[in-house]
Regions:
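Sec-exported extracytoplasmic/periplasmic mature domains
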Residues: 15-19, 83, 97-104, 130, ...
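Aromatic-glycine-rich donor-binding/catalytic loop that engages nucleotide-sugar donors
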Residues: 75-86, 163
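Hinge/lid segment of periplasmic solute-binding proteins
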Residues: 8-68, 84, 93, 120
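Extracytoplasmic/periplasmic solute-binding protein
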Residues: 47-64, 69, 93-142
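Short, solvent-exposed loop/beta-turn-alpha elements that line the ligand-binding surface or hinge
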Residues: 24-38, 112, 130-152
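Extracytoplasmic/periplasmic substrate-binding proteins
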Residues: 4, 11-13, 119-123, 155-187
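Extracytoplasmic/secreted proteins, especially bacterial periplasmic and envelope-associated proteins
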Residues: 9, 73-76, 87, 91-94, ...
Length: 187
C-alpha cells in the first residue's frame, strides 16, 4: 500500500520492520506543522535505537489517531448529587459508589474484554508510574511490566471493578460500554 492508517500502538512494529519509508525521501522540504500533536513522537522513528525520537528519527507518518483515553461520566447525575468530576482513582470509587446499584446501574464500566483491556489499563499503569518497557527512548526495550508500580495499578483497577464495576467486566468492549452509557445503566 502507498498510504495506510494505523493507530499509534502499532507504529513501532511497522517502523521497526521497515514497512514505513521516510516522508522526507519523497519530499525533502516537508515538515510536520508544530501545531499538530505528536503523540509522544510517534511520527519519527530512530532506526538505530529502535524508538520514537522526534530529535534524531526519520519522519514516518502523520499522527491522526492517538487513542487518547477519556473518562466519561453523566454530568446530570453528578450535578444531581453535587459531585465533582474525580481527580484521583479514590475519588472515582467514592463518586461511582453513589450510583452503584446493580443490575439497574453500575458506578463504573470498564472495557476489560480481551484486547480492550490494554486500552483501559494504560491510564492506571501510567498514573502509577508504571511502564511496559524500561527505557524505549534510549533503545532499552527490556520488559518491566511485572513491576511494583504496575502491580499497584492493577490492584486499583481490580478494586474499582470489584467495588463499583460490572461483575462481567471481562466481557465488556467498546460497544457494550456505549450501550450501558446510552441506556442509563452507567454513571
Amino acid at each position: 500500500y502507498d498510504i495506510v492508517i494505523t493507530s499509534t500502538e502499532f507504529m513501532a512494529t511497522y517502523a521497526n520492520s521497515g514497512e514505513f519509508i521516510n516522508f522526507n525521501d519523497i519530499d525533502p522540504d516537508f515538515k510536520l506543522d508544530s501545531g499538530i500533536c505528536g503523540y509522544q513522537d510517534t511520527s519519527y522513528w530512530n532506526y538505530e535505537t529502535r524508538s520514537f525520537d522526534a530529535k534524531n528519527g526519520e519522519f514516518i507518518g502523520i499522527p491522526v489517531n492517538g487513542n487518547v483515553q477519556v473518562l466519561y461520566y453523566r454530568r446530570d447525575l453528578y450535578e444531581e448529587k453535587g459531585l465533582q468530576p474525580p481527580k484521583t482513582w479514590d475519588d472515582l470509587i467514592k463518586n461511582a459508589a453513589e450510583f452503584h446499584n446493580p443490575p439497574r446501574m453500575y458506578g463504573m464500566i470498564q472495557r476489560s474484554e480481551r484486547g480492550a483491556v490494554t486500552y483501559n489499563f494504560g491510564p492506571y499503569m501510567f498514573s502509577y508510574g508504571g511502564a511496559v518497557y524500561k527505557d524505549p527512548q534510549n533503545g532499552d526495550f527490556s520488559i518491566v511490566f511485572n513491576s511494583e508500580n504496575n502491580r499497584k495499578a492493577l490492584e486499583k483497577y481490580l478494586e474499582i471493578r470489584d467495588k463499583v464495576g460490572h461483575p462481567n467486566a471481562h466481557s465488556i468492549g467498546q460497544g457494550e460500554m456505549i450501550q450501558y452509557l446510552r441506556t442509563g445503566k452507567a454513571a
